[in-house]
Amino acid sequence: MMGEAIKEQILAVRDTALTNMFDIPAVQKIASDMGYFELVLFLEENRKAYVQFILTGES
């Protein structure tokens, strides 16, 4: 399950406008640079839930 903290971190990375949000390795790099290590790990284990959130805004 995707918690509120993960959602907020995804939105913060998106707001940087530094990458396409479907470029997951780039999202992980930006998240790491921002100190969002929980998001980096989440993306390793929950890519399907992440893509669903990006596409629909729902988790």
PLM feature segments, named:
Residues M1-A26:
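N-terminal acidic leader/helix
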Residues D23-S59:
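Short, charge-rich amphipathic interface segments used for partner binding and complex assembly
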